[in-house]
């Protein structure tokens, strides 16, 4: 075996044993001693809790107001039906975060996932999955089902507080299991490379719900793990600096026209005659300057001072860089 004693062995995918369409065993080797458990446990946790997928989140059943009820002609109660709907394996086209599918069935017999009506963006991976049973020929059931894209497991109770208070009566929330991985286990066995016999072999045994192939699930889990570990490769401070909110150069009220002060006609006309068009122009004038304005007496001056004071302004203010470019261009 060539290479430095400090170099780590790089594992390779040795075998994929496809037991059926949803169950496979994936073997990787060789791994340095201890790395079998290190990588196996990390991948297992990601596969169980962090894989994105689609799940039923809401359902409306015709004639049903709440989950603690039954429906005539249906063998199961509503809670059992909701539990069965959690088992739907749904694949939704990329780019869509939520879709609605419908189910309408009548007549005695089982109601299965294959009875669901949907468009081309939706695929039911387990069409034989039983949702409920109708007990007589006159029985019928109709429901509207919401499917959303998400990650991990989100109980209905966690979404109650985020839903709108006006959520219609009869819209039932369902615990959402988004992860396409149903079961996952790993084992670490002995491996050998040339004269080294202290190496690990990692065997991952996984079952999915059919919306994702086991090999692809492991690939995605490894990608998630690698992306999370990227931060440890370069430990320099990579925090994004907070963007300081730029304060406007002038208080917006100063940029408003004098007409917004709703002065008397006499006072307003006097100011316009002196080319005082904006409140910012006005507050820079002193009382003495305004009293020199033709036809503007002490009564008008008092009115102007009172109106400015009601807005937290006064005469004789100094404004640097006035007027701003936007006004100067006008």
From Swiss-Prot:
Q: Which GO terms describe its cellular component?
A: cytoplasm; DNA-directed RNA polymerase complex
Sorted UniProt keywords:
DNA-directed RNA polymerase, Nucleotidyltransferase, Transcription, Transferase
Describe the protein's quaternary organization and the partners it interacts with: Homodimer. The RNAP catalytic core consists of 2 alpha, 1 beta, 1 beta' and 1 omega subunit. When a sigma factor is associated with the core the holoenzyme is formed, which can initiate transcription.
Instruction: Tell me which Gene Ontology terms the entry assigns under biological process.
Output: DNA-templated transcription
Q: Where is this region: Alpha N-terminal domain (alpha-NTD)?
A: 1-236
- Spans annotated as Alpha C-terminal domain (alpha-CTD): 250-330
What the protein does comes down to: DNA-dependent RNA polymerase catalyzes the transcription of DNA into RNA using the four ribonucleoside triphosphates as substrates.
* Substrates-to-products reaction catalysed: RNA(n) + a ribonucleoside 5'-triphosphate = RNA(n+1) + diphosphate
Supply the Pfam families for this chain.
Answer: RNA_pol_A_bac, RNA_pol_A_CTD, RNA_pol_L
| Gene3D superfamilies noted in UniProt | 5' to 3' exonuclease, C-terminal subdomain (1.10.150.20), DNA-directed RNA polymerase, insert domain (2.170.120.12), RNA polymerase, RBP11-like subunit (3.30.1360.10)
Q: Does the keyword DNA-binding apply?
A: no
Domain comment?
A: The N-terminal domain is essential for RNAP assembly and basal transcription, whereas the C-terminal domain is involved in interaction with transcriptional regulators and with upstream promoter elements.
Q: What is this protein called?
A: DNA-directed RNA polymerase subunit alpha
Family listed: Belongs to the RNA polymerase alpha chain family.
Q: Which InterPro entries match?
A: DNA-dir_RNA_pol_insert, DNA-dir_RNA_pol_RpoA/D/Rpb3, DNA-dir_RpoA, RBP11-like, RNAP_asu_C, RNApol_insert_sf
**EC number(s) stated in the UniProt entry for this protein:** 2.7.7.6
The UniProt GO MF terms for this protein read: DNA binding; DNA-directed RNA polymerase activity; protein dimerization activity
């Amino acid at each position: 075996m060539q290479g430095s004693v400090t170099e780590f062995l790089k594992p390779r995918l040795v075998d994929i044993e496809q037991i059926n369409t949803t169950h496979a065993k994936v073997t990787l080797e060789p791994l340095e001693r201890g790395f079998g458990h290190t990588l196996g446990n990390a991948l297992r946790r990601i596969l169980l809790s962090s894989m994105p997928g689609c799940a039923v989140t809401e359902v409306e059943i015709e004639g049903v107001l709440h989950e603690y009820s039954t429906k005539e002609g249906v063998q199961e109660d509503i809670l059992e039906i909701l539990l069965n709907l959690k088992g739907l394996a749904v694949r939704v086209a990329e780019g869509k975060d939520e879709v609605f599918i419908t189910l309408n069935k009548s007549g005695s017999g089982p109601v299965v996932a294959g009875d669901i009506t949907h468009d081309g963006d939706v695929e039911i991976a387990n069409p034989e999955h039983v949702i409920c049973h109708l007990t007589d020929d006159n029985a019928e059931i109709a429901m509207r089902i919401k499917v959303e894209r998400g990650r991990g497991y989100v109980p209905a109770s966690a979404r109650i507080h985020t839903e709108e208070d006006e959520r219609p009566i009869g819209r039932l929330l369902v615990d959402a299991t988004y992860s396409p991985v149903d079961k996952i286990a790993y084992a670490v066995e002995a491996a050998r490379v040339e004269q080294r016999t202290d190496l690990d072999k990692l065997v991952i045994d996984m079952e999915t719900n059919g919306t994702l192939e086991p090999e692809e699930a492991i690939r995605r889990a490894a990608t998630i793990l690698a992306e999370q570990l990227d931060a440890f490769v370069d430990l320099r401070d990579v925090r994004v600096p907070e963007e300081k909110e730029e304060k406007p150069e002038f208080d917006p009220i100063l940029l408003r026209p004098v007409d917004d002060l709703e002065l008397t006609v006499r006072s307003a006309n006097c100011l316009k005659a002196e080319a005082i068009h904006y409140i910012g122009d006005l507050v820079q004038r002193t009382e003495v300057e305004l009293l020199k304005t033709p036809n503007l007496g002490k009564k008008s001056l008092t009115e102007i001072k009172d109106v400015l004071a009601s807005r937290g302004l006064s005469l004789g203010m100094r404004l640097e860089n006035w007027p701003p470019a936007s006004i100067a261009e006008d």
